[in-house]
Amino acid sequence: MLTRDGAGRILRARWPPLVALTATLAYAVVVIGFGLDFRPLHNDEGVTLGVASRASAIDVLRVAVEHRHGPPLHYLLVHASLAWRYDILGLRLPSAVLGIVAVAVSYGFGRELVGRGGGAIVAVVTASSPITIHLGQFARGYTAMIAAAYASAWLMLVLIRTGKARWVGPYAVTALLLVSAHPFGLFALFSELVLMAIFAAVRLRHGLRGQRRLAAAVVAALVLGGLALLLLRHLYSPLQGKYGVGSGTSVIKLGSARFWERFGDAASGSTHAGFGVALAVATVLGVAALAVRNRRAAIFAAVWLVLPLVLLSVLTASSRDFAPERHLSFLLPGYAVAMAGFALELRARAGARFGGLVAAAAVAVLLAPGWVADHNELSDFNADLRDASLYMADRFGPDDVLATTSGTLSQAEDPRLVGAYAVLAAPSSSPLASWQHAGPVRGCKLVRRIGQRRAPVGTVWLVMSVPDPRPVAQSLRTAGADVRGFGTFLVASAIPRQPTVISALLTAHYLFHTAVEADPSAYDVRRMVRLYRHAAAVDASGECSR
């Protein structure tokens, strides 16, 4: 029979893996259970959907490599998920699952570097980071990069410690996955190869006698890792022209207060500079403490955090698309190790009796702003768009058309992709599920997209998001449309005068114009007025049939 003392001994002996397991399960629940199915699509998710929804994996790989020059691993994973279920969950599930994998693997990585207690702290930091929470909810390759960074770093450390050749193959695979997940994985892998060379040099500083197997394993791992780096560097090289690499200013200005403010806000989860500064101080102190007690961990954290920043400060690019909260997410292993070093040092200095409580309290205080940010993000969603999509899907006929979606959404959310969301949310039995949404196309492409059914046009459907939907809905009803509101989203439908494409275009133009007259501040809807007027004109001229 398990007694209280026995249970206490078990908890004291096994608390690190239990904490890591709790962190992993908590991350899984909050990411998958809160809003994964409801949020509008981000700009980049449209690219992911366009590539990953190709007919076959070979076609996905071809488009990813030859046309997008993007991360093939991410597109292939999303393709497999969409083959399982073609909906919003299928689109975003790989990112969520790989975020869960990242948290789980982070414990093993941390245990290898800073012990069982440190591994638990690494898992908690990874699971509760606002960066990890945010990136796990959207269909991009960042969580794949984080998970692969943890896995490859863990295998690299095991390889150096054991010197066994059996770890070379698994390491090479994870290194390839790291650079296949995202272009910025190149910086993570380069740091990893530098660390491998440093750790191997330390092990071999007294000569090769008795360590030839270690030397051979390290050389093989370095060669294979280097080949993965060069291979994906070649794949991503066309992106240099897109982002103006080699011209413009530094990607990162280390002396820029704006960069550190934005990076600190993302890491801490708060716009108050003091919280970001506190995390930075704890990180530096953690590395300093590790330099005294665990030099291997100190070297890892220092190189992993500093080397990529130095490289990116030297690299120049004219593009303004760099976002530290996403592109530098691969720094998470170094940051988590430094935080673990800080907590372990506090525990050691506070003594055996209260050290654990002091360390836990300090970590909780440092991570609290991030937890608040996590709560705010996870609670900031509603089912309005999904309800609107299901309402339309239930009534969408086989000859109906969905016009370009428009309106005002949150930052980085694309109103043109509301149509893509509606198609993904529609049950397979609804004709809406097979509709190819208009997206951002215009002119003759828009004409062909509206006429894709090649049949007499039935009802024209519009979905728009406006700040004040009541007057817009009333005006649309007065104009003869059927309107249903879902929060700020309006679903409007009307039958064109004639069952032709040009009549459908003119009907959509009229409804958009009516909405703008009711709410002149709906600037994106105003764009649709011009877009559909032009499409109707080019269709009437016969230009699109040539």
Residue ranges and their predicted role:
Residues 1-13:
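Short, Lys/Arg-rich, polar N-terminal cytosolic tail immediately upstream
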Residues 3, 42-43, 537:
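Intrinsically disordered, low-complexity regulatory regions of eukaryotic regulatory proteins
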Residues 13-527, 544:
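Membrane-proximal helix-loop-helix interfaces that form the catalytic/acceptor-binding platform
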Residues 529-545:
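Short, low-complexity, Pro/Ser/Thr/Gly-rich segments in the mature regions of secreted, periplasmic
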